[in-house]
Amino acid sequence: DFIHARSEKEIIYTRNTSESLNLVARSYGETHLKAGDHILITIAEHHSNLVTWQRVAQKTGATLDYIYVDKETGHFPEEELKKIDDPRVKLFAFAEVSNVLGIDFDPKPLIQRAHAHGAIVVLDGAQSTPHKPVDVQDLDCDFFAFSGHKMCSMGGIGVLYGKEELLNDMEPFLMGGDMIEDVHEQETTYAELPAKFEAGTQYVEGAVSLVAAIRYIQAIGFDEIRAQEKRLVTRCLEGMKKLPFIHIIGPTDPEEKEGLVAFEVEGVHPHDVAQILSAEGICIRTGHHCAQPLHIYLGINASCRASFYFYNTEEEVDYFLEKLKDVRKVMGYDD
């Protein structure tokens, strides 16, 4: 009931979002796409939803196209969204929320638009599922992937949702025990869904921890989670705007940010920023955040990212901002 699938047959346990997307790419993309078809993704994708489709394009002869964000706002211009209307697009894959820009791309209208022109839609929910309610039936996406470790469960557990009729039409991604019905010397029949895609001994501990995390999140409620995250992001952005050496990546309006803020510190490499903050007990992410093409497109070598969840406090945000002021001082700047 967490993402409102129609049946448990539509829920497949994987290791993470990356494996879920690879499953779709291998079991659907490589067998259902061909030369002349187009795969459409966005420049804002995590590598798991980009490199996978590069490979499918290379193996099938399909063409890989991109929707580009506006470099100033981070949103998709209508001129770029018109690419969805191309009838040659047979598969459209994109993230509901960017893990760099922090933007919720409002997937439902994009899904409807893609379906109107005959495309299958793969939605990466890794950055959205921990922070907002998800209803795959209302969204009407064909596939939806997310990870447990981003929402308080143990690592190594993920989920792929797929419409039952599509999953039934796909070959298994992995072969082995438990995904079979009958095995003979020259042929095998496969088990019913979801076991068909769950070969071998499953990570039971991870699945149990994911269920516990879901129940915990549901007990708190997404209204409270979103309200707390909005308070934290607002406080962070307001503080950063007062620091002239900080460049915020993507929108600076907290209403357009979902639980994270990516930024640059003028004159200081992101890895140095992380090292200095780490010495003060603050953990941030630095580098490309598995979104190198987006950084290249934006003309950014690398960036820092501060992520917030409901367990963070406004006092922690204030501490982070205070220590951020010290970063350039440590590097010898006199601000």
Describe the predicted segments one by one.
Residues 1-335:
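Pyridoxal 5′-phosphate
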